[in-house]
Amino acid sequence: MRIELIDLEYGVDPDHSILRIEHLVIEPGQPTALVGPNGSGKTTLLRLLHGLIRPRSGRILGLDSARTAMVFQQSRLLRMSCRHQLMLAGWLAGQPVGQLGAAADLWLKRVGLHEAAGQRATTLSGGQQQRLAIAQALLRQPELLLLDEPTASLDAQQTPLMETLFQGCQSKPHANGEPPSLVFTSHDQHQVKRLARREIRLEQGQIVSDQLL
């Protein structure tokens, strides 16, 4: 999914913009890291790309929220079993009903939660909830994957496993022949180097650098 932002501004206060972007293009197959200090606008940009909030002015071209998935810093899970949580995600993404159970089981195994399939999602530990949220996003096979500090709650053993899944989704083109677009935030510069081909730095709601890695 190719997305273009033009003359975009976002902010609740009409006299102050939290985010201001003159022009930005997100290309498919080019994993992009958003870096910068807390409060620089990284999460706001992800939320705009997901269609959760609307800009005060400007345009976002090419965005289709139905083909987008996001992993938040704080997992948003329902009071149902882990397996049903993933089956619901697949159903909402329009996947065949007869394949929902198998897909859920596959992704639970991939994120190491197969033994917790029947456990209520909201009773999992913070790291387990984050892994379930990652499985939920990847199961949807999105054309745009947005990750907000996706491994912040994970330990040193689980982080590389999740990074491998992120890299794996990049190698699988969609029906249109394009690989998924990946945009993520991270304060871990080593993770940025492992996952990203492009780094965008934000400060005080504006892009101050944009470079290929």
Regions found by a protein language model. Give the residues of each.
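Helix-to-loop junction immediately C-terminal to a conserved catalytic motif
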Residues: 50
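Hydrophobic anchor residue at the start of the ABC signature
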Residues: 134
